[in-house]
Amino acid sequence: MKTLAPSYLKHQFLIAMPHMADPNFAQTLTYIVEHNEHGAMGLVVNRPQELSLADILEQLRPDETPPASTLQVPIYQGGPVQTDRGFVLHSSECSFQASVALEGLSLTTSQDILLAIAAGVGPKQSLITLGYAGWEAGQLEAELADNAWLNCPFDPEIVFGMASDLRLEAAAASLGINLHLLTSQAGHA
């Protein structure tokens, strides 16, 4: 009997099913940063907070007034883990002190990227979050088996090119799915 290798979801979207009961993830679209035998890490990309980059910069540098343009840069709720820690998902034409290369993207956790974005010399595309979503080994696989999530290929246009309130539906539409027509009942063969 042939054993199948596990299928991991790194660099894909997770689409919360309409019946998702967990308030941390109901109606969310999550970008999977890492997924392997040890667990998974992702960033929710469609939940803006009532914070802007200006608010963050005021906390980091209280003696300086942030540029007015930073009032228009939203901060997203990336997930329920380490909600005081910032993560910036961005295009990879720039690198910073604490950047990790992803597939065509980078993830940065150092403050230098925030200052670069504020100065207008940051990456062309970026999304700033506080916190992340984390799953222990096997946890995400179990949630997928329980039909809590759909997955689909990552599309940078969804994250960087459209309003946050359109992202979940756009990801589902990329699969030909209208989330409003799905049932919470599922069968297994």
Curated annotation (Swiss-Prot):
Domain of life, source organism: Bacteria
Disulfide bonds: none
GO cellular component: cytosol
Annotated Pfam families: DUF179
HAMAP family: UPF0301 (MF_00758)
Family assignment from sequence similarity: Belongs to the UPF0301 (AlgH) family.
Full protein name: UPF0301 protein PP_4995
Species: Pseudomonas putida (strain ATCC 47054 / DSM 6125 / CFBP 8728 / NCIMB 11950 / KT2440)
Phylogenetic classification of the source organism: Bacteria, Pseudomonadati, Pseudomonadota, Gammaproteobacteria, Pseudomonadales
